[in-house]
Amino acid sequence: MKNIYGVLKGPVLTEKAAILQEIDGQVVFKVHPKSNKIEIKRAIELMFDVKVKDVRTASMRGKEKRVGKTVGQTKEWKKAYVSLAEGEINFTDEI
């Protein structure tokens, strides 16, 4: 991906993500499924002006959903666990 604004889709606001942020200083983002770790790191550093130490990614499979007799499926998506460098501030208070 060439556009850094197309890489990040938004933060993942779950209980697990909040615990990871408090304990390890990690932030979880929903990202474009075809983006790689280098693009994710570059996008976060440019958009939020923070230093990224490490990026881990996980591809999430779409779930099967049923409405009456009709069976469908949610889209597959990707999330990134981003570890911030020591001394970086908590920037998710602004989100």
From Swiss-Prot:
Keywords: Ribonucleoprotein, Ribosomal protein, RNA-binding, rRNA-binding. One of its GO terms (molecular function) is structural constituent of ribosome. Transmembrane segments: none annotated. The keyword rRNA-binding applies. It comes from the Bacteria. GO terms for biological process: translation. GO terms for cellular component: ribonucleoprotein complex; ribosome. One of the early assembly proteins it binds 23S rRNA. One of the proteins that surrounds the polypeptide exit tunnel on the outside of the ribosome. Forms the main docking site for trigger factor binding to the ribosome. Belongs to the universal ribosomal protein uL23 family. Part of the 50S ribosomal subunit. Contacts protein L29, and trigger factor when it is bound to the ribosome. This is Large ribosomal subunit protein uL23. It comes from Desulfotalea psychrophila (strain LSv54 / DSM 12343).
